[in-house]
Amino acid sequence: MSMSFSFQVEATQGAARAGRMITPHGEVETPVFMPVGTVATVKGIPQDLLEELGVQILLNNTYHLYLRPGVEQIRKLGGTHKFMSWDRSILTDSGGFQVFSLSELRKVTEEGVSFRSHLDGSSHLFSPESAMASQIGIGADIIMAFDECTEYPAERTRTERSMELTLRWAERSKNAFEAHKHEVPWFAERGKKSQALFGIVQGGMFPNLRKESAERTVEIGFPGYALGGFSVGEPREKTAELVANTVPLLPENKPRYLMGVGYPEEIVQYARMGIDMMDCVLPTRAARHGLLFTSEGRLTIKNQRFASDEGPLDPNCSCKVCKRYSRAYLRHLYASNEVLAQVLNTTHNLSYYLDTMRRVRQAIILGENSVSLPVVRSPHLSAT
Ligand SMILES: Nc1nc2cc3nc(NCCc4ccc(CCO)cc4)[nH]c3cc2c(=O)[nH]1
């Protein structure tokens, strides 16, 4: 079987790295921000526009696709790339986190997590084995081990038990993946290449549990490592401190993926700490609620002060929204609850995030120290 997945570091600056992942569906330049396309769509913008924005990898969610349209349906249609007509890279999360953030009546046992669908109340069980079977059937290029995202706050004993469960599930995930990885729908047509399974580090807010989880996850051995259990309501300073201490424990020749992060200033901060991949619903969800990120900070477009503002959303942005429409028009669309508001706002926010990451990558390669960005201290006050 030829090389399924590779990662090279191309330049470093301090802890930061500029790199390149190669998956069965193409190359991904890192550091990378991955738009969330939960049910095989990045809400509000079509695939050709995502390509125009330069998206090289996006997320799908196993939890959602398992419930609708179902893994079997997607597998029969050749996998999620064919299904959503996306010929670049895709990553799927393994479902455990979504069960806890979306479904009712969850019960965790050694076997896995039983839950009821948030769509129709039907009962289901997710286990490491079923999560691998689902992610193989869906067919993303990078898939995640089935883990337990330890809730916040959690006592040390609870966090340790949760970490141990995740480590046992990581072993089971890897064993199930190795046994079935050739069953991915596009195995033959992509040169007998298979998916890459990433491990997930837990350990909550305890530095020594984070260290133990990182070391034991690396001992199991994966082509890439995610930091889970963050962006779960903990103080952002706590996240930064624990990420800074955990990253050096991960192999420098493999990608590091910080799940569920974050604000524009955060993705710059974490890229500087040596994180290579990030994802968050923030830019797309915030767009749908009229919260827009610009080079001058964030703004809520429905604010009265934009009613007759003929200027662009962001004078320093080269996206097609900022090149064509006025703030007055964008405010009008949002106030009128027009569907075009969702499309234009999402296009801009994603463009801003992707452009920010491109600038960080350039700064690492060119050796510049500055990536000029708004360092917004108290986001809630500045949302005008
Ligand atoms: N498998 C796995 N997946 C995860 C996904 C996560 N996503 C997050 N945080 C996202 C939090 C988040 C949710 C919504 C918004 C929009 C504004 O409200 C922003 C951030 N933390 C996460 C932790 C894990 C984890 O341990 N394991």
From Swiss-Prot:
It is an enzyme of class 2 (transferase). Keywords: Glycosyltransferase, Metal-binding, Queuosine biosynthesis, Transferase, tRNA processing, Zinc. GO terms for biological process: queuosine biosynthetic process; tRNA wobble guanine modification; tRNA-guanine transglycosylation. The keyword Transport does not apply. Binds 1 zinc ion per subunit. Gene3D superfamilies: Queuine tRNA-ribosyltransferase-like. Its cofactor is Zn(2+). InterPro entries: ArchSynthase1/Queuine_TRR, TGT, TGT-like_sf, tRNA_ribo_trans-like. GO terms for molecular function: metal ion binding; tRNA-guanosine(34) queuine transglycosylase activity. Catalyzes the base-exchange of a guanine (G) residue with the queuine precursor 7-aminomethyl-7-deazaguanine (PreQ1) at position 34 (anticodon wobble position) in tRNAs with GU(N) anticodons (tRNA-Asp, -Asn, -His and -Tyr). Catalysis occurs through a double-displacement mechanism. The nucleophile active site attacks the C1' of nucleotide 34 to detach the guanine base from the RNA, forming a covalent enzyme-RNA intermediate. The proton acceptor active site deprotonates the incoming PreQ1, allowing a nucleophilic attack on the C1' of the ribose to form the product. Belongs to the queuine tRNA-ribosyltransferase family. This is Queuine tRNA-ribosyltransferase. The lineage of its organism: Bacteria, Pseudomonadati, Acidobacteriota, Terriglobia, Terriglobales. The gene is tgt.
